[in-house]
């Protein structure tokens, strides 16, 4: 078994991850004659409930600030225990006065879910917290509330990267967070494959995540770590906008170096196609749209068919670790663009002379949803794709074999670039007939012609490392450099410059980029 442990840091991440886990639960099958195409043991852990019954809960650790969990309790129906809230006798002989904050009431959806009643339709008004549309039970050790900071506090806002960094260091000194929170899940694994991290990166959670990943690298060495770096795509006042940009720049500079794949995501995307009906005032809507792309592009790592294949690794493709996320979404009654170009594949490796460069270009053109604030620069004839993972989910697919295309005559991409100065394109394509399921916890009108709960969406999603990322990193470097304090400037600017250079070496030089 090759398990994955998920880390969820902060409110925005928990909205996205709740959609993700709801979808994973929908893949469960309950008949011996019906096998799920998804290997649930990768992301879920078996256990024993308080009454001795077997449980199966997400292999995840959820961090949020005080007030961020809504009505979700640490001990749920599976693990209900009587808590001894009194102090041990002998320590205090006086009267006890216990002060409790009032509990946040459950949503009508959660009440109906627990009682097995027909579920009411969710709306932006009834989804107050991510727990309001959650469909799963979590192990008590998965719930980690950080009481030192309160959600949406004006007195102690959790907005500055350095605040999150200092907060993690303080907690880690006192509790050793890896030993307390992470190691119990890691020790349950037969063969830990990697770590999937959802985190905010344009606020204090970026600093918290950076130091957490440092600890993970120290303890778990070369394990896969893929980071979904979530940023607010909504406009705000100028000073706060700059703080977000500075936080994002620090996160990119530090976290991407420690990640196998770093995927910056704007929530919501800056541009939306006509078929998306997005309520930008609702984190539930915004995270639902993002979840379609994220759950789809990570799907091959959970499918039984692709067991043993690492879609995140593209032949050791070199130093490009920042990937842009893009997608196209259609209802089950609509065709995906370029669907006619999907062809059956007889082998998992394509010869060099089979690489179709027109098909590479079409691969770029078919996406109409760009989630990444990095790599979103306008494509030019000089844009190069270093590597790309593409996943097509369409019930009409006539093949579920992976397809690999590489320009390089059998040499690894990294070795070829060292020998010739030219960086090849490496493309990995995965196809599955398993479409994205529409659940009753998903907004009912997000996609044009979207069907009711029980229907599906067709999805074409990709992660791409392109030379456009290098250009955007240089733009970010210039923007931050104009206003950042002198004591922070050198390390951050140099870090961004090194990252941007990885997307130019062997393809375009500094003089081509138009920078001084």
Swiss-Prot record:
Pfam families: Misat_Tub_SegII, Tubulin_3. Keywords: Mitochondrion. It comes from the Eukaryota. GO terms for cellular component: mitochondrion. SUPFAM superfamilies: Tubulin nucleotide-binding domain-like. InterPro entries: DML1/Misato, DML1/Misato_tubulin, Misato_II_tubulin-like, Tubulin/FtsZ_GTPase_sf. Disulfide bonds: none annotated. The keyword Nucleus does not apply. It is found in: Mitochondrion. Its main location: mitochondrion. One of its GO terms (biological process) is mitochondrion organization. Gene3D superfamilies: Tubulin/FtsZ, GTPase domain. Belongs to the misato family. Involved in the partitioning of the mitochondrial organelle and mitochondrial DNA (mtDNA) inheritance. This is Protein DML1. It comes from Coccidioides immitis (strain RS).
